[in-house]
Amino acid sequence: MSKSINLKQRPVGTPTLSDFEFNELDNDLTVSEGEVLLEAKYISVDPYLRGRMSDAKSYVPPFKVGEPISSGIVAEVLESKHEDYKKGEFVSGLLEWKEQQISNGEGLQKVDKSKAPLSAFLGIVGMTGLTAYLGLHEIGNPKKGETLVVSGAAGAVGSVVGQIGKILGLNVIGIAGTDEKIDMLKSEFGFDHGINYKTTDDMKAAIEEAAPNGVDIYFDNVGGPISDAVLFNINQFARIIICGAISVYNKTETPMAVAVQPFLVKNSALMQGFIVRNYADKFPQAMKQLSTWLGEEKLTYKETIVEGFENTPQAFLDMMDGKKKGKMIVKV
């Protein structure tokens, strides 16, 4: 019997295991014409899911209490009555946290495990890579020789942003929360500089030291005081990509930030929110470039793989707490 993981209640502040519940599904998994039966193989857990657990208005609807959570999943086709999919093929898509489920095929993409490991289609050649590539290119408009700062740099998106920056000839500075992560950024991902925000008393000064010529592009994954410190160091015509704000996702009230307008006005800087699905028409080209770079070994990636469907909620909590390297994925 297949199981699902549902949102039991809306978290107040930091989510806990009690906010999730397991449900045994007794629904019919008979495949009708135009449908496929899927079995989950890998589940992506991501910071944006925290926002969907609240009922606040956002760019995607909130999860419903008592119903399954959904995220990016790679699944195997167990049975098919859909003309586009065959038994034994693998697909990725936004699917519910269920061991098995029926799909009408909408939103599914075939994945070729001969080109990359299945888990990579949730990461570097999936939405993670697309977010990094398109955010940097479409808003960052990078030019060789410029300085790029990445917060949440040891995370799934941040680590790819930094590597793309190096491919494009940028000076790349990464911000992360442990010395081990800083070492990884420089030794494995090729970042030029790293700043441990947890052991740095004056982030403004640390950024100024690492970027004596100022910051041209800031890829913001965290928000909060770290991002405030970067603003003090931006150059004229700087571009700031707002991709996430994990530092405030668990806050019951969003804290007041430094007033950004003076920094933007005096530097003629651009600050823009980024949602990857708004650039869906550019996915094929971006995927092609990411796959090429991966094949040329210009890109590398880190994954934290958690074994077992039953451990998905804990994997989400650990991801939110920074207890991972690179992309957090559950192997079902």
Range-by-range predicted roles:
Residues 154, 158, 162:
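N-terminal Rossmann NAD(P)H-binding glycine-rich loop of SDR-like oxidoreductase domains
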Residues 298-305, 313-332:
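C-terminal capping/lid region of NAD(P)-dependent oxidoreductase domains
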Residues 29-45, 53-97:
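Glycine-rich beta-strand-centered segment in the early N-terminal region that forms part
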Residues 71-76, 84-152:
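NAD(P)H dinucleotide-binding glycine-rich loop of Rossmann-like/cofactor-binding domains
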Residues 128-131, 156-157, 226:
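Hydrophobic/small residue at the entry helix of a nucleotide-binding pocket
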Residues 225-298, 332:
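Glycine-rich phosphate-binding loop and adjacent beta-alpha segment
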Residues 166-229, 277:
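Adenosine-nucleotide cofactor-binding segment
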Residues 152-153, 222:
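NAD(P)H cofactor-binding loop motif with strongest signal on the N-terminal glycine-rich segment
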